[in-house]
């Protein structure tokens, strides 16, 4: 990640922490105050990507998404030993896991 991307990311986090709407103008103002040269396109991209999203909620979801595969992976040996009913339960869990992973709000151009 380049310095300009990193500075823009930090600027977005600062604005979100203060409860201020994230716009390209505000991102550019913060990066300019930090003496970091950022091309206006980066501020626009970040602002559009985060438009209408709760950045704090996105950050909270990252931790829970990372824990999900570990819990699902532990059920595989039990499914093999438990027979057909356990295998069916495993398929249901996998399907639920796939559905929950479909849209976590991380799309760049949503």
Swiss-Prot record:
Residues 69-110 are annotated as: Disordered. It comes from the Eukaryota. Pfam families: Ribosomal_60s (PF00428). GO terms for biological process: cytoplasmic translation; cytoplasmic translational elongation. GO terms for molecular function: protein kinase activator activity; ribonucleoprotein complex binding; structural constituent of ribosome. InterPro entries: P1/P2_N_sf, Ribosomal_P1/P2. Residues 95-104 have a biased composition (Acidic residues). Its main location: cytoplasm. The keyword Phosphoprotein applies. Keywords: Cytoplasm, Phosphoprotein, Ribonucleoprotein, Ribosomal protein. It is found in: Cytoplasm. Residues 69-85 have a biased composition (Low complexity). One of its GO terms (cellular component) is cytosol. Belongs to the eukaryotic ribosomal protein P1/P2 family. PANTHER family: 60S ACIDIC RIBOSOMAL PROTEIN P1, LARGE RIBOSOMAL SUBUNIT PROTEIN P1. Yeasts contain 4 individual small ribosomal A proteins (RPA) which can be classified into two couples of similar but not identical sequences. Each couple is distinctly related to one of the two A proteins present in multicellular organisms. Rpa3 and rpa4 are essential for cell survival, whereas rpa1 and rpa2 are not. Component of the large ribosomal subunit (LSU). Mature yeast ribosomes consist of a small (40S) and a large (60S) subunit. The 40S small subunit contains 1 molecule of ribosomal RNA (18S rRNA) and at least 33 different proteins. The large 60S subunit contains 3 rRNA molecules (25S, 5.8S and 5S rRNA) and at least 46 different proteins. The acidic ribosomal P-proteins form the stalk structure of the 60S subunit. They are organized as a pentameric complex in which uL10/P0 interacts with 2 heterodimers of P1 and P2 proteins. Component of the ribosome, a large ribonucleoprotein complex responsible for the synthesis of proteins in the cell. The small ribosomal subunit (SSU) binds messenger RNAs (mRNAs) and translates the encoded message by selecting cognate aminoacyl-transfer RNA (tRNA) molecules. The large subunit (LSU) contains the ribosomal catalytic site termed the peptidyl transferase center (PTC), which catalyzes the formation of peptide bonds, thereby polymerizing the amino acids delivered by tRNAs into a polypeptide chain. This is Large ribosomal subunit protein P1B. The gene is rpp102.
């Amino acid at each position: 990640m380049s310095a300009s991307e990193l500075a823009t990311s930090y600027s977005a986090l600062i604005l979100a922490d203060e409860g201020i709407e994230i716009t390209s103008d505000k991102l550019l103002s913060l990066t300019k105050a930090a003496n970091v040269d950022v091309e206006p396109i980066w501020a626009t991209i970040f602002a559009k990507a985060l438009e209408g999203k709760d950045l704090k909620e996105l950050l909270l979801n990252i931790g829970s998404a990372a824990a999900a595969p570990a819990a699902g992976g532990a059920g595989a040996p039990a499914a093999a030993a438990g027979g057909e009913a356990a295998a069916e339960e495993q398929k249901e869990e996998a399907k639920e896991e796939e559905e929950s992973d479909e849209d976590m709000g991380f799309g760049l151009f949503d």
